[in-house]
């Protein structure tokens, strides 16, 4: 290669992503065939070659138009062939040059060039620019960790302004476009100004990076170690090309959304929340709130159901297997099944089981679920006084949660569970709201298809749910709420029912739990009856179950201790196991008594006899009532007393008896409060007997309310009262005529052992109760 009309011919080496300034010495790795041949040609001539940068890095075989026209003439100082076929070259930049013409393009590029001479500028201007450039470069080095401090020392020794600009530019991480601009600028002052502007921008960027770094550092110091680790993990994932944690989480939730059976409105809601979540940093507290909300919507059943088992015989078997008696609620469930089988679209009933503790209300609801083949959910409402417990909290509150209804549906996993609202009569209200009012929507079949929970902010359909509520009393349930439920009363178990429950359910279960087979423990009928009568007094069977467990524990101790291999419990040996009887029941009088009548009472624990005693004392007409009587019972005594005064002469009683005598009415067991109107005819009969001296038949028990005109009004609890009369040894029952229809509710064995006298007036009561009829002046 040589000179031609003031121009120089040189081989061309196109550079990718690299630019060489004059005076620069650096290594290059050359791998392209054309480039290797250009190097070989340079070594044949005078070791000179033109280094020019191609515009696009990714082009393997660039054309002349894709190579910058200005480059640097360099001297090849050393060549080393590497094992992989590439050549490592040590080059030194000499001078700027411009490509005038491409002389050869086939085997390698040969170009005609002209050298570019630097244009001088005003010395003072250049000197000022050089100083400013050095100052800015020094600040840049302090801020940047990419340039070593030793570089500043070597740069400060450079006196030529053009070389200074080239050396500083070579140490800056500039874009290729900016580097090429500096290379193409031959005017020294312009080159310094361009570089100063670029360096100033770089320094400002580094200042901003430093401020951001300090701010991030302070923020990281205030947060937990977990934040720092997550940031590191995020940076690592970014470097590896992985998706960051938040995006991966959102993608996972979107995949879950595709498979969800939620309605379109719910899917749209979830998608909107996902868009919000996507824009939030992984450490955002709001992000975790949104994630919890989305998880709640996913967890709720929207269409999943369990198929009802509509086999009535199967349902009847399951209900009878789990519970003895309880005919009314069982019958209602079977009716629902029958209608469901015919219609196949009936909404679930809303039942309210009312009765004393321990009669099986809660366990019956569980049995209903088993009979229907549905999921069972129970929530206790006892003591709940916050409306948010039912409807949930709005998501703006910290720690917000859905209400118990929605949580119960999540737990069920289906849209048609049996949902038990236990102890609905124990709801309370205060300044936080009235939960009973919130339940109005839940328990209304015409409204609960759009139940609104504050947390999920969307309506939820409860029409397929079978709601069952339980209560001990209806008195505390608000009227609008009670109106929405079908009330089924469950009275306390009779003695006979308890005996059957003990024999068929409780004792076998306790024997199994205590590892006692029939060959190890046997309890006869008399012992069971004694256990029911004298060791428990309750409407339900919870204490009876405990006493059965007590018997099993005592028997287990005897057997394990080696005293006996088999324990037989009789009425006599029961006391040895459980101690003295804890309760006693009233018994019939042993002989006919004057002024003493056996009444019949009903309590939450069942029926019992109630003796009423009357004494006539000399005095001035004072009426004394003792035995801890309630207001209603006192009024009944006064009504009976007034009625007897009005008819005293007809029964042979001194019309002036109330002026000459004090009358004392006493009901024994004074420590026990007593109230109610049903002892009215009992007290009236006792008064007539005491005033006439005619005894009352010992086998008679009675119940009924009395009026001032002697009429007998109906009462409640006849079944339990007659059971207690039978237990006490009574054989005759006097009852109001209006209660005659209730006789059929009494167990047949008891009904056949008793003689019933329905009455409408006190005269009829006296006719059946006294040993002889009082005789006086008839009007």
From Swiss-Prot:
Catalytic activity: Hydrolysis of proteins in presence of ATP
SUPFAM superfamilies xref list: P-loop containing nucleoside triphosphate hydrolases (SSF52540), PUA domain-like (SSF88697), Ribosomal protein S5 domain 2-like (SSF54211)
GO CC field: cytoplasm
Subcellular location: Cytoplasm
Induction line: By heat shock.
Catalytic residues identified in the record: 678, 721
Keywords from the named record: ATP-binding, Cytoplasm, Hydrolase, Nucleotide-binding, Protease, Serine protease, Stress response
GO biological process, one term: protein quality control for misfolded or incompletely synthesized proteins
Binding site residues for ATP: 355-362
EC number: 3.4.21.53
Pfam families, alphabetized: AAA (PF00004), Lon_C (PF05362), Lon_lid (PF22667), LON_substr_bdg (PF02190)
Domain Lon N-terminal as annotated: residue spans: 10-203
Lon proteolytic domain boundaries: 591-772
Gene3D superfamilies, sorted: 1.10.8.60, 1.20.5.5270, 1.20.58.1480, 3.30.230.10, LON domain-like, P-loop containing nucleotide triphosphate hydrolases
Main location: cytoplasm
GO molecular function, one term: ATP hydrolysis activity
Subunit structure as annotated in this protein's UniProt entry: Homohexamer. Organized in a ring with a central cavity.
Function field: ATP-dependent serine protease that mediates the selective degradation of mutant and abnormal proteins as well as certain short-lived regulatory proteins. Required for cellular homeostasis and for survival from DNA damage and developmental changes induced by stress. Degrades polypeptides processively to yield small peptide fragments that are 5 to 10 amino acids long. Binds to DNA in a double-stranded, site-specific manner.
HAMAP family, per database record: lon_bact
Protein family (similarity comment): Belongs to the peptidase S16 family.
Listed name of the protein: Lon protease
Species: Brevibacillus choshinensis
Lineage, broadest ranks: Bacteria, Bacillati, Bacillota, Bacilli, Bacillales
Encoding gene per record: lon
């Amino acid at each position: 290669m040589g000179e031609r009309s003031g121009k120089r011919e040189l081989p061309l080496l196109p550079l990718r992503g690299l630019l060489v300034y004059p005076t620069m010495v650096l290594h290059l790795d050359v791998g392209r065939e054309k480039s290797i041949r250009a190097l070989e040609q340079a070594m044949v001539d005078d070791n000179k070659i033109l280094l020019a940068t191609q515009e696009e890095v990714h082009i393997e075989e660039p054309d002349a138009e894709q190579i910058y026209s200005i480059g640097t003439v360099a001297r090849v100082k050393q060549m080393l062939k590497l094992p992989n076929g590439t050549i490592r070259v040590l080059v030194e930049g000499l001078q700027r040059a411009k490509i005038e013409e491409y002389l050869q393009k086939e085997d390698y590029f040969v170009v005609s060039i002209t050298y570019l001479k630097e244009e001088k500028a005003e010395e003072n201007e250049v000197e000022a620019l050089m100083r400013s450039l050095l100052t800015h470069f020094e600040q840049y080095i302090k801020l940047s960790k990419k340039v070593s401090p030793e570089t500043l020392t070597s740069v400060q020794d450079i006196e030529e302004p053009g070389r200074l600009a080239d050396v500083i530019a070579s140490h800056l991480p500039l874009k290729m476009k900016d580097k090429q601009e500096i290379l193409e600028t031959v005017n020294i002052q312009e080159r310094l100004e361009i570089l100063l502007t670029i360096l100033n921008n770089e320094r400002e960027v580094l200042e901003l990076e430093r401020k951001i770094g300090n701010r991030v550092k302070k923020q990281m110091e205030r947060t937990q170690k977990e934040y720092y680790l997550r940031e590191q993990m995020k940076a690592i994932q970014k470097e590896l090309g992985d998706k960051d944690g938040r995006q991966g989480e959102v993608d996972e939730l979107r995949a879950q959304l595709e498979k969800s059976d939620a309605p379109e409105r719910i899917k749209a809601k979830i998608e909107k929340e996902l868009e919000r979540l996507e824009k939030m940093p992984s450490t955002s507290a709001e992000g975790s709130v949104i994630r919890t909300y989305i998880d709640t919507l996913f967890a709720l059943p929207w269409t999943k159901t369990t198929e009802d088992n509509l086999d009535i015989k199967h349902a009847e078997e399951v209900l009878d297997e789990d519970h003895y008696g309880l005919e009314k609620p069982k019958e209602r469930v079977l009716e629902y099944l029958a209608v469901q089988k015919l219609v196949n679209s009936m909404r679930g009933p809303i039942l309210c089981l009312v009765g004393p503790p321990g009669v099986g209300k809660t366990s019956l609801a569980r049995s209903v679920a088993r009979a229907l083949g549905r999921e069972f959910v129970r929530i206790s409402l006892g003591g709940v006084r916050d409306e948010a417990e039912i409807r949930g909290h709005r998501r703006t509150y910290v720690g917000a949660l859905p209400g118990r209804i929605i949580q119960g549906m999540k737990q069920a996993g289906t849209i048609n569970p049996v949902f038990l609202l236990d102890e609905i009569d124990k709801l309370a209200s205060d300044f936080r709201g009235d939960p009973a009012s919130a339940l109005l929507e839940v328990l209304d079949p015409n409204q609960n298809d759009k139940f609104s929970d504050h947390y999920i902010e969307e309506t939820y359909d409860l029409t397929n749910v079978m709601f069952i509520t339980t209560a001990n009393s209806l008195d505390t349930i608000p009227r609008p709420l009670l109106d929405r439920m079908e009330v089924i009363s469950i009275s306390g178990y009779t003695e006979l029912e308890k005996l059957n429950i003990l024999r068929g359910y409780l004792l076998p279960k306790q024997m199994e739990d205590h590892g006692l087979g029939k060959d190890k423990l046997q309890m006869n009928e008399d012992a069971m009856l004694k256990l029911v009568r004298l060791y428990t007094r309750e409407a339900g069977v919870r204490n009876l179950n405990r006493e059965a467990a007590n018997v099993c524990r005592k028997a287990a101790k005897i057997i394990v201790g080696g005293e006996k291999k088999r324990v037989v419990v009789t009425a006599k040996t029961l006391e040895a196991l459980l101690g003295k009887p804890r309760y006693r029941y009233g018994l019939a009088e042993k002989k006919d008594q004057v002024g003493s009548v056996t009444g019949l009472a009903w309590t939450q624990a069942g029926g019992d006899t109630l003796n009423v005693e009357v004494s006539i004392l000399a005095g001035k007409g004072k009426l004394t009532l003792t035995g801890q009587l309630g207001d209603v019972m006192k009024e009944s005594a006064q009504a009976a007393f007034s009625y007897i005064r009005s008819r005293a002469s007809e029964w042979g009683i001194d019309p002036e008896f109330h002026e000459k005598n004090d009358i004392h009415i006493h009901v024994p067991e004074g420590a026990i409060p007593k109230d109610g109107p049903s002892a009215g005819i009992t007290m009236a009969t006792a008064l007539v007997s005491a005033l006439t001296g005619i005894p009352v038949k010992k086998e008679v028990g009675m119940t009924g309310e009395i009026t001032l005109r002697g009429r007998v009004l109906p009462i409640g609890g006849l079944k339990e009262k007659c059971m207690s009369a039978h237990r006490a040894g009574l054989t005759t029952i006097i009852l109001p005529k209006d209660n005659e229809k209730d006789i059929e509710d009494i167990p047949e064995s008891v009904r056949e052992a008793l003689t019933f006298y329905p009455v409408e007036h006190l005269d009829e009561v006296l006719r059946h109760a006294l040993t002889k009829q009082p005789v006086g002046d008839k009007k």
